Amino acid sequence: MSEMRSTYVPPLQLTDGQPAPIAANGGVSYMSFERNGDAGTSVAIEDALKQIDSGVGQAVIDLIDNAPPGPIETKWGLGFRRYAECLDYIRANNIEAPEGGLAIPLRYSISEQPSYSVVSSNELWRDPQREEDAMRLRKDERDEVRRCLYFPQILRDARRIEEYHPGLSPYTAASMDKLGVSLAHCESECQNFYDHREVERVFYREMEELLLDFFPGATDALVYNHDVFDKHYQGDRTENQADKNPGVNANYANLVHNDLNDNSGRVRCRELLTKNLRNFGRQVNYTAAEVDEKMSRRFMSINLAKPMETVQQNPFVLCAWPSFADQPYINNYRIYDDRVGETTRFTYRPEHEWYWVPEQQPNEVSMLKCYDSVTDGSVSRWSFHTACINPNLPDDAPCRRNLVVRSFVFF
């Protein structure tokens, strides 16, 4: 890192034995390429446009569009353009799940190139001199969905993890250490999960206490923001960052992904601790030296999902770390005006070990790891996740209503 810069540049810290990510600059953060305090955003946009010009993204679309009807043979296995096609294949081939599980199509990217997303707040969208660039970038981002296919997978009941990993209870920190997935219980006192102020006042505190109780040796837990998911919500969905109001999401992320990676896990933690950036929770005020000391010890990013009612359609599904620990992740760059964030995608493997919580109850909390600072391979670095469609439910089954809170846990 360099303290002379206006922007913190994270050191690239790969897991021992992990292949290099599929990323620009060999995985080095774009914030290394700062120009006049822009945190590398100009170079990131230039690279996004160069990649569009190269045609590699269009080549993936052409491969799918020009393939004959039916299954598409990929290097990873048979993929399908549509959910229904993949489901028919699962049923025709008698692909079955164990008790409590579900055989299901899941949507993966088949593009082995980094992707770029210029966020809506970026000034590029309002610059008349860059209208042509904006059109190209918008089209390419929309085309990302055309670079995905459905693949058959099996979900296992996360409550029964001990059947698949003898001696490992899903209700323990050991499950998070090994798999990147755990379960917990919470009888929340929060009465209105659509009231962001009540959520931040009541539920954040409950989740921080849960995390400190759950992880032996944890010294601090900071819940910093949340999302609400409810397709059927009839009220105002508007997000208001200034008021710390996340709004209400009508859509569910139907693509295998993770929210953080080797770079962004450190960046997100540091910008919270030093700037309270996008922090909806309790405010913190650490000096740079104090943050360096805090981040020199182990810390993790954990997402916690709690339903408002029994989950039926669009359940949240989680993948266990050992089944993809040796697999390179693919970077997605989120370009703001003042920083370049990073999330990740993954290509399909039939060996991916997926879990869900069938009919997850309002007092059941599913937890997934988005980042762990331990890189020696002794613990999981992260999980990845997606929403999915349960084909065994009627068409009018209600969609998931839940909260997802994001946190950092420090040791």
Outline where the language-model segments fall.
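Generic low-polarity alpha-helical segments
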Residues: 1-4, 405
